[in-house]
UniProtKB/Swiss-Prot annotation:
Its biological purpose: Binds and inhibits voltage-sensitive potassium channels. Inhibits the vertebrate potassium channel Kv1.1/KCNA1 with low affinity.
A molecular function (GO) term: potassium channel inhibitor activity
GO terms, biological process: envenomation resulting in negative regulation of voltage-gated potassium channel activity in another organism
A GO-annotated cellular component: extracellular region
Name assigned to this protein: Potassium channel toxin alpha-KTx 11.3
Family: Belongs to the short scorpion toxin superfamily. Potassium channel inhibitor family. Alpha-KTx 11 subfamily.
Protein keywords: Disulfide bond, Ion channel impairing toxin, Neurotoxin, Potassium channel impairing toxin, Secreted, Toxin, Voltage-gated potassium channel impairing toxin
Species this chain originates from: Parabuthus granulatus
Lineage: Eukaryota, Metazoa, Ecdysozoa, Arthropoda, Chelicerata
Top-rank taxon, per record: Eukaryota
Amino acid sequence: DEEPKETCSDDMCVIYCKGEEFSTGACDGPQKCKCS
């Protein structure tokens, strides 16, 4: 299981904000992405 990354170019990746799945709105904390 790979750690979420700071950036990701794949549209299929899930964005995580503060460790939670995040898809819309403004993220006011650390944002990372994870590719399956």
